[in-house]
């Protein structure tokens, strides 16, 4: 706990009772092997259950705390990116803050529960992710649909806007899964000064940019036909370390995002009779195909944070219903995962996926067969 105490000493606005409680909480979460809730935390420590409930309602600067912790852990010369994703958390009852219908990836359907948006910093060279800030998706507004209301995309952007000041200075790229590849979100991220690396639909509407001579009169020609992923002859080919993975890249115009993108088609020929592909992109048209592939592959580290927080830190076991206590719980679980989860398992899984080159990019669920 010496490192945690040193970080708390560097933070302003932390009272001695709050400091002592946080040190106790971190240590207790490491030794608790049952459900991590207020009752079991009090059983494994000298702190009363009501004290846990009271402190969980007090504000704590988790983003600042995690920022100081990462400054001690991340080498300055390593390549770093940020990742953002949301995860479903089961929750029963009727009066819990944020209770709504959300997509549950494990069940592949919409279910009643909570959703938590997480922003993490990913060390691309070490292939490891660090949780920075977790925010719960707010409940739907009671405003009539005829009036303009904030959407979940607006919430994700606001979460990013609040967390961006805590990023390491070298972070310039953000990676997101295909659910975030919306014009409103991509435009908002770029407005903050970051580039987006994400995934497009297999049937994305893309247009080649016209590179030929222009006519002396009339409007200048911008496009040179629709992109067909069955014909990659106009793409630049790049080999990878995996013999069955090949990258094809080109700068095109995205009709849905209304901007130029560098698109990378990752073709998997492991089954020659049925090759598969996914379509990645970056808003930075100067970024090479290998880096786009490497950055998106590193995005999967945020999934390990969610997995370990749920398995080892009681992410879905909170005995609270109000917004402040839930916010404290989700952030404490993500931090507790970093300090107490069996990091060797995460590293082994990440290394195994990195060797195959297909952990988060070419899984069977999201591959698409090339039309011959």
Name what the model sees in each region:
Residues 142-217:
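Domain-level cores of phosphate- or acyl-group-handling catalytic modules
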Residues 41, 79-92, 119, 173-180, ...:
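Short, conserved catalytic/metal-binding motifs centered on acidic residues
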Residues 88, 289-320:
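Short amphipathic alpha-helical "interface-anchor" segments enriched in bulky aromatics
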Residues 40-43, 51-54, 106-171, 259-279, ...:
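Electropositive, glycine- and tryptophan-enriched low-complexity nucleic-acid-binding patches
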Residues 55-130, 135-138, 246-251:
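Active-site-proximal, Lys/Arg-enriched surface segment
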Residues 6, 10-18, 28-94, 162, ...:
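Electropositive nucleic-acid engagement tracts
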Residues 25, 31, 275-300:
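Extended, non-catalytic structural segments that build the interaction scaffolds
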Residues 1-21, 29, 127-136, 145-149, ...:
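A short, flexible helix-boundary coil/loop motif
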